[in-house]
Amino acid sequence: MEKTPRDFIFDNLLSMSAYWACTGAIIASLTAYYGFSLALSNVVTGLSGTLPILQLAGGLAYERTTRPLRFLRLCNGTWRVLLPLVFFSVLLPRTAGAPLMVVCYVLAIGIYQFACPSQTDWLVSSVGGRVRGDYYSVREMFFMLTYTGVFCAVSLIIDRAARHGAQQTGFLAVGVLETMLLAASLTVLLRLPAPERPEKEEPAPAAAALLEP
């Protein structure tokens, strides 16, 4: 397998495993730690299901940008920095840590969803026609294996910490694990080539004449 398709697999394994392992039940545990009400906890934990609406805006923004590689690196780099801060927020007093956690989580999820269309276009334009037919199925298979391992590790850390009355330590450990995964993913991200964009066709002379006032 060529270097670029392989790097896209590694980037997906590292970043998506870190992202999906820290949604749902793990975030619910963190909201319980901060003493959120049930209504607020449901809103926060449900963001991964409600914020995909931002993909519409993200696709339009990516289509209009003149610097696609910069757009991709900025969006993908930002949410990968913000996500571990969600768990490191427990280092602050709860009155300050709770709002910081919510802000970082909303921004991380929102920016990830905003960048999804551009990320898909980047992958397809970079590896299309250069990989075997089973590339995408192999990519998903390895992702599921990695995600399962990361999710189990995170769940065990949180459960063990809760049983020993050391929830803060547990969330810090999850933050360290997230930082390691996402830092590794950033090194891979910076190696990925610029997306290939087809040149926009100029309108035919006859068509251009029709458009003139």
Regions found by a protein language model. Give the residues of each.
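Short helix-loop-helix connector
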Residues: 31-35, 66, 123-131
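Hydrophobic core of transmembrane alpha-helices in multi-pass small-molecule transporters
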Residues: 13, 82-83, 89, 95-115
